[in-house]
Amino acid sequence: MIVKQCEWISKDAKEAMLIISDGKMQCAAFSHPCYRSAGDVLLEPLLAVSIKNIAKMRSDSQPYIQCLRGSLAHEFLAEVTNLEKSLVVAGTFIIELDDPLPGDISLGDMISFSCGRIDVIS
């Protein structure tokens, strides 16, 4: 995941919105404190905050990330890669959910969900 663009919300407070891309998909993420700039590589998972509408999808579903209404809210279709840490993958994006996954979700399942915001953890 690479920082494509950094838009400062407040330079004094070190708050920024980052556009993050893997060349195929992209998302907007909140960062505070932000020490990132365009071209930086992100190695840590992104954090999906305020998770809603988790649903199991068909195993042959194609992963996607969709920004909702030009905000920091997003909709995802991703593969579950770690149940204990609530980690999912969409393309090369690794996303940690801020809530535990429901009990009927298994490792390798494709799930869809929405979140109120994506945060850069590091």
Residue spans of the language-model regions?
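Short coil-to-beta transition motif at edge beta-strands of beta-rich domains
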Residues: 59-63, 108-110
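Low-complexity, flexible helical/coil segments
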Residues: 40, 54-58, 78-86, 113-117
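Beta-strand/loop nucleic-acid-binding surfaces
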Residues: 21-36, 91-119
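Short, basic/aromatic beta-hairpin or loop at an interaction surface
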Residues: 12-23, 83-92
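Acidic (E/D-rich), amphipathic helical modules within compact regulatory domains
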Residues: 14-59
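Flexible glycine-rich surface loops and low-complexity tracts that mediate binding to linear polymers
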Residues: 6, 39-52, 108-122
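Structural detector for short beta-strands of small beta-barrel domains
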Residues: 1-11, 63-84, 113
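Glycine- and charge-enriched low-complexity intrinsically disordered segments
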Residues: 69-107
